[in-house]
Each structure stands twice: as structure tokens, then as C-alpha cells.
Regions:
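N-terminal signal-anchor transmembrane segment
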Residues: 4-74, 97, 101
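Alpha-helical transmembrane segments of multi-pass inner-membrane proteins
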Residues: 139-167, 171-231
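Membrane-interfacial loop-to-transmembrane alpha-helix junctions, especially the N-terminal start
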Residues: 26-36, 76-91, 137-142, 225-227
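Structural signal for the C-terminal ends of transmembrane alpha-helices
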Residues: 65-78, 124-134, 212-221
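Lipid-exposed faces of alpha-helical membrane segments in multi-pass integral membrane proteins
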Residues: 34-37, 41, 62-66, 86-97, ...
């Protein structure tokens, strides 16, 4: 009877450990996808604003922020003062101090609040994920941007009639060339705007994706085919 009880206790302990590891893996995966979505919103924010508008785009960003905070808390992470990088904090503090001699102090104060908020979120993201997972989240976000960009460009090139305006500008008639979201030049070999609606940020995202993929492959030596295809 004692032997059976010991075996039952050991099995229960192993089961609890496996369940705990599974929960941790699930939380890490959810955190990675949430951070990837935040990176997507950051690097392709113009496309999101083109869909929802300047005010409406705050809603998906707020949902992402709340999701991140909840996951950050339930994962047991915390923002300790020693985790704050000194140089970054000094720079943000100096920018905040500039409100004292700014010609537009109220506007400077608004941007100071925004800078402080973004700095806190950035530090929290760095604390929430280890470096390998953080690079993985960046790669995911960049792949989503590049993938959605080619899908949009292909749809407009094959089925569209001329350039595509962002949804918030539909029904406004002819627009200036710089206002259009997708130019539909994919089949003509012209430059593509992609989901960000601007060729320059899209090219920057493509470059960052290439750098992250190469660094991850050099570190892990895995996913050679997928890395090659994305490059």
C-alpha cells in the first residue's frame, strides 16, 4: 500500500510539473504572438490608420497593450528599477526637461508623455521575452508585413482597376498620388507600397527581416529552407 501511494505521489508530481511546463510554454507563445502583433502595429501603423482612421486605430492598439499587460502580469514578470537602462532613461528625462524652454510647452508635454509611455512599454517587452524569443517575435511581425503586402499588391494588380486608396478615403474621388495605399504596379515591375502604404518603410522592414533571419540561422543552424525562401 505504501509503495502504491509513493508511486501515485510521484506520478502526480510529474503530472503537475508537465502541466506547469505546458502552461509556461503556452504563456510564452501567447506573449510572443502578442509582442509580434505590437511590432506589426508599430512598423505598419500607417496601414492600420488607413483602415481604421487616426482615432479608430487606437482601439486595436489599446487591445494589444491590455493583452500584453495581462500576459506580463500572469507570467510573473515585473519592472524593477535595476532593469531600466541608464542611458535611455537619461535621454528621455532630458527630452522631458526640454519642455521648460520649448516654444510650445503643451505640445512638448504631450510628446513627452508619449515618449515615456513608449519607453516603458519597450523596456517591458525586453523584460517579457528572452532575446531569442524577442528576435522570433520581430521575425513574425516582419513576415506578416511582407506577406500581407504581397497579397494586397497581387489582389490590386490582378483584380483592381488602378491604384487603391485606403479604406478611410473611399468615395472621395480622385486623390493626389501620394494618398493612395496600393499603386498596383506589381505586374509592371514598379515599386510596391505594401501594407504600410509606403515603399521606404516596407524596404526597411524587408532589410530588418533579412538581418534577423540571418542572425537566427547563424545562432541556431535551423530552418535553413524557410530562411532561404524568405530571403
Amino acid at each position: 500500500s505504501l509503495s502504491v501511494s509513493c508511486m501515485t505521489y510521484e506520478a502526480s508530481t510529474v503530472s503537475d510539473a508537465v502541466g506547469s511546463d505546458g502552461d509556461d510554454a503556452l504563456r510564452t507563445r501567447m506573449m510572443r504572438y502578442t509582442v509580434a502583433a505590437m511590432f506589426f502595429a508599430g512598423f505598419a501603423g500607417k496601414g492600420i490608420r488607413g483602415i481604421f482612421g487616426d482615432i479608430g486605430s487606437l482601439m486595436p492598439m489599446l487591445i494589444l497593450l491590455v493583452s500584453f499587460v495581462v500576459l506580463f502580469r500572469i507570467s510573473g514578470r515585473s519592472l524593477l528599477l535595476r532593469r531600466f537602462p541608464t542611458t535611455t532613461c537619461l535621454f528621455v528625462a532630458w527630452c522631458a526637461l526640454s519642455c521648460a524652454w520649448s516654444v510650445a510647452p503643451l505640445l512638448s508635454a504631450e510628446y513627452t508623455v508619449l515618449s515615456v509611455s513608449l519607453t516603458l512599454v519597450s523596456i517591458a517587452v525586453a523584460v517579457a521575452l528572452p532575446l531569442t524569443e524577442l528576435v522570433g517575435a520581430l521575425i513574425l511581425a516582419f513576415q506578416w508585413i511582407i506577406g500581407s503586402s504581397f497579397v494586397l499588391e497581387a489582389l490590386v494588380a490582378f483584380f483592381g482597376h488602378g491604384p487603391l486608396a485606403p479604406p478611410i478615403m473611399w468615395g472621395r474621388g480622385l486623390l493626389p498620388a501620394s494618398y493612395y495605399w496600393i499603386d498596383g504596379l506589381l505586374l509592371k515591375g514598379g515599386p510596391i507600397q505594401g501594407f504600410p502604404g509606403n515603399r521606404n518603410p516596407l524596404a526597411f522592414v524587408a532589410l530588418l527581416l533579412a538581418v534577423c533571419l540571418i542572425l537566427r540561422y547563424m545562432q541556431t543552424k535551423r530552418s535553413r529552407l524557410a530562411t532561404f525562401l524568405w530571403l
